[in-house]
């Protein structure tokens, strides 16, 4: 016996299905469902009178020993990922995603590959969007509270360096030396997110670099405040090649030790993560942006220049002065700061992100960037570029899937690949840690509904604890049980170099968290960047700072109004 319902009735019960489009927040972007794993009429839903009950969509006979029985299922989720926009159930077991498919009871339902049993909990994701937890690869570990702010924006992994509020940490993403690295690895035991630390990359003595990799650093940071010379960079890359770790570069703004071409000559054909490749965050003035054309450079933006607005240039001078410990009474310090800020290259940056020339977005937390705005600013750029440049190839009305996949890759899978952690995190795929962010569509990109970290709810919008229902005002983000007791040790990862892992750094420091090695880094090229691997010819006019791609000038207009702003953040 069949039952017919209208499309609007179906959507209100089970969320969108194939061909339906969902608007992302108050942006102009629409995600269209490409595939639905559901069998119409066999949808698994929880609640009074719903299907997930004993003997119905919940199997009464299975136990947790069955490998297909889930610990947790997110039902009828709209998954937005770098390679798919699909409607599916998400099965989680032992803290990992084990299946994207159809949940229910295979005894009475067809095509079930995620079994719901007595040991299964449910998160109702009907009508909601689920994305992979975001990855911020430019974090100054200045303040432990950054982790909570990031979680509440949809970020579940931090990579960078620092030791707290030292001048070194405030200016450079560096955790210098074995002693500091060990202390930060121990501090990470209580952080509710995944973390990895980068060591200081300035030393001609390889032993001084190698001891940091042995101590657990997942890479080296070369920063101009410590001296970003071609020599220092080359030595850091030598060690990185030996130990399969990444090098992140904040290049030489003043061109003291050479120009952009000299830096690239020192790099040779070795892979490198180029921080804030536009240059306002630091790097060869005025043409660092040209490095994004190289096939061995993995370029990222930091979020204060994204998107380009009428306020962007004005706010940057003070940020540079404070972050880099400059003195406003010294003319040379003012000149240094001023040389980094060029509206022409900033205006071009949004376009390069939209073309897939820039591959990643990060924060530069509390050091010329905002740790809670990586996700928001990424989608603001996507909105602005659709406004100014129209749909990408293959997109059309109510279908921005190609642009959406390009932009979500910038803070999920591509940072994971760049730093050797894509086997563990970065996408909604079977086998990966269940770091998932759930959004009401109208709040997408601004405020998540809840964050699942390693299979446990870690942070969620919830009401007054004395309320009679969970939605009693005030509704606000609250820590969930995933952050209490020993749960962090079972749901969050600490990333270390492979050599530190093999030498038992977790035993040496008595680390309780899941410790995992980074890997497969030194063989990367830009071709490995998902949906963001373009390598056109880039030129910068040395007088006007105008940017040209394959001979064509690129620029964007300064925004005076943006989505995902005051409408969402009045309270």
UniProtKB/Swiss-Prot annotation:
PTM note: Carboxylation allows a single lysine to coordinate two nickel ions.
GO cellular component, one term: cytoplasm
Entry's localization field: Cytoplasm
Domain Urease: 133-571
Positions of substrate binding: 223
Pfam family, one: Urease_alpha
Chief place where the protein resides: cytoplasm
Cofactor: how bound: Binds 2 nickel ions per subunit.
One Gene Ontology biological process: urea catabolic process
Matches recorded under SUPFAM superfamilies: Composite domain of metallo-dependent hydrolases (SSF51338), Metallo-dependent hydrolases (SSF51556)
Entry-annotated residues carrying N6-carboxylysine: 221
CDD domains: Urease_alpha
Residue numbers binding Ni(2+) 2: 221, 250, 276
Gene3D superfamilies given in the database record: Metal-dependent hydrolases, Urease, subunit C, domain 1
Cofactor: Ni cation
Enzyme class per UniProt: hydrolase
Keywords: Cytoplasm, Hydrolase, Metal-binding, Nickel
Residues that hold Ni(2+) 1 according to the record: 138, 140, 221, 364
Pathway: Nitrogen metabolism; urea degradation; CO(2) and NH(3) from urea (urease route): step 1/1
Known EC number: 3.5.1.5
NCBIfam families per record: PRK13207.1, urease_alph
Assembly behavior: Heterotrimer of UreA (gamma), UreB (beta) and UreC (alpha) subunits. Three heterotrimers associate to form the active enzyme.
Family stated for the protein in its record: Belongs to the metallo-dependent hydrolases superfamily. Urease alpha subunit family.
Record's protein name: Urease subunit alpha
Gene that this sequence comes from: ureC
